[in-house]
Design a protein with these regions (language model features):
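Structural recognition of the beta-strand scaffold that forms the well-ordered cores
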Residues: 13-15, 66, 74-77, 96, ...
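Solvent-exposed loop/turn segments at secondary-structure junctions
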Residues: 18-21, 71-72, 81-83, 101-103, ...
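Short acidic, glycine-rich surface-loop motifs adjacent to enzyme active sites
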Residues: 245-278, 301
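Subtilisin-like serine protease catalytic core
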Residues: 94, 133, 143-182, 186-237, ...
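Hydrolase catalytic cores
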Residues: 225-229, 312, 356-419
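Residue-level detector of functionally pivotal "anchor" positions at catalytic/ligand-binding pockets or at interdomain
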Residues: 431-463, 473-474
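Autoinhibitory propeptides
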Residues: 54-137, 143-146, 320
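Catalytic-core environment of secreted peptidases
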Residues: 172-179, 327-376, 413
Length: 477
């Protein structure tokens, strides 16, 4: 019989005063090259957390789970007596309690599992037959970029989520483009096992390709981050996410898609208010803004609380300089559950929308096409679209890619509290400033170009110039 012990588990974020003894820059060669190409200087935020301080914290009996070089601190588990000793140290600025749990543990274990709600309560398969995945890409006018050869090649995408069931075995996901994975949670189950499939569904929207399904950026490379605890909802998960975003920066990823968000928690003492959604208060929002300064494009789901008491967006979706994504249906109508903006400080949120109601996805269990609901699934569509645009404009900065996407949206001049700037047009986003914003004929549709239309035959009523997808003048015979 296994012995058990009733314990109170505490997790804290310990923020340090400075970076004494820090000599190591936490950037890979790839990341360093990206910084040089974009003229982004190395600064103190790129240096490791003080190893001297970390050793001191460990020596007092705390377990260091992970660190944040941007916020300059560490996530630790320990008891109240030890944390009081740590807080009294001169090198400690502030200590934040991030999780307090009570449970029966097998002796020798250091984590507890308490059932919590689903990562995305609206992310459920639905009964009607799914639309062709091509339709949700077409809504973003992404197909012309695909036809021009821009499907995300050369772009590295991270997906931060809560579970990647079968992501390592799904035949529709390109294994040659998989860069790796990292787990920042306390969950002891297998990364690709029973931790849920929410992350895998999101990955499928970006990268899956088979005869009846096409993701948004099937030629991108990708890295998987598990940051969402399976059984609890606490501020510790935001610190997990911050650690993942910093790793993404270290690896030299271009984009991170995050279909997670935080408003209220299992323990009400940690709950945010709408006033907190100002892009500055949460460590997640702070880290997101830093990531943007470091050259990454973060794409974050707005949240599924539009028809609930909370109503507004979550964090880190409130961060500045990112793309927060709302959900619409295939006809462009807002989903009732899509969370409202603006941010508490008045910025337009969400920035853009994509299909998040009846989104076409691949089931990780059997590879069949299914549908799901949630801004969770609109988010990876925008992340994939951004990857295609960036592959077409490889010298562009993250902020230029973001700005092009926003300016191409159909409500850009009249933003809305739920649509934001609206649904982007990726072909237009590519064309702005490149000379390629031209009418075209593609393999998928018949388009009307002034007096030109297709109805069994092509008729031209007046002398117009027609261009193909690459912007080259073509002749109609």
């Amino acid at each position: 019989m296994t012995s058990q012990l009733l314990v109170i588990l505490f997790t804290f974020f310990v923020q340090f005063t400075d970076k004494v003894g820090c000599e190591r820059v936490c950037l890979s060669d790839v990341a360093m090259e990206m910084r040089e190409q974009r003229g982004i200087a190395i600064d103190s935020l790129d240096y490791e957390v003080s190893p001297i301080y970390l050793d001191s914290v460990r020596a007092m009996g705390a377990k260091v789970l992970h660190t944040s070089r941007w916020i300059n601190g560490a996530t630790v588990t320990t008891g109240l007596q030890t944390i009081a000793q740590i807080e009294a140290c001169d090198f400690v600025d502030t200590v934040y309690l991030t999780r307090e749990e009570e449970g029966l543990l097998p002796l020798g274990k250091t984590s507890v599992s308490l059932r919590k709600r689903m990562v995305e309560e609206n992310s459920l398969p639905s009964d009607p037959p799914p639309p062709a995945s091509i339709e949700q890409l077409d809504q973003l006018n992404l197909l012309p970029l695909h036809q021009a050869g821009y499907r995300g090649k050369g772009i590295r995408i991270g997906v931060a989520d809560g579970g990647f069931y079968n992501a390592n075995t799904m035949s529709a996901l390109p294994k040659a483009q998989w860069l790796g994975y990292a787990d920042f949670t306390d969950d002891e189950d297998d990364f690709f096992g029973s931790s849920g499939n929410h992350g895998t569904l999101c990955v499928s929207a970006i990268l899956a390709s088979q005869s009846d399904y096409e993701g948004a950026a099937v030629e991108a490379e990708y890295f998987l981050f598990r940051t969402e605890e399976q059984y609890t909802e606490s501020p510790k998960e935001l610190d997990n996410w911050v650690a993942a975003i910093e790793m993404a920066d270290s690896l030299g990823l271009h984009i991170v898609s995050t279909s997670l968000g935080y408003t209220t928690f299992d323990d009400e003492q940690f709950d945010f208010t709408y006033a907190d959604m100002d892009g500055r208060l949460s460590r997640g929002a702070q880290a997101a803004a830093i990531a943007a300064r470091k050259g990454m494009l973060l794409v974050v789901a707005a949240g599924n609380d539009g028809n609930k008491a909370w109503h507004y967006l979550s964090t880190p979706a409130d961060a500045d300089s990112i793309l927060t994504v709302g959900a619409v249906d295939i006809d462009g109508e807002i989903a009732a559950f899509s969370s409202f903006g603006p941010s508490a400080d008045g910025r337009v949120k969400p920035e853009v929308c994509a299909v998040g109601k009846q989104t076409s996805l691949l089931n990780p269990s059997d590879g069949w096409v299914m549908t799901g609901n949630g801004t969770s699934f609109a988010c990876p569509l925008i992340a994939g679209a951004a990857a295609c645009l960036w592959s077409a404009l490889p010298t562009a900065s993250n902020m230029e890619i973001r700005e092009r996407i926003i300016r191409s949206a159909d409500r850009y001049t009249t933003p809305h509290e739920q649509y934001g700037y609206g649904i982007p047009d990726l072909w237009e986003a590519y064309g702005k400033g490149t000379g390629n914003n031209l009418p075209y004929v593609d393999d998928y549709h018949a388009y009307e170009v002034e007096k030109i239309w297709y109805n069994g035959q092509l008729f031209i009523k007046k002398n117009n110039t027609l261009y193909n997808i690459l912007g080259t003048n073509i002749t109609i015979h």
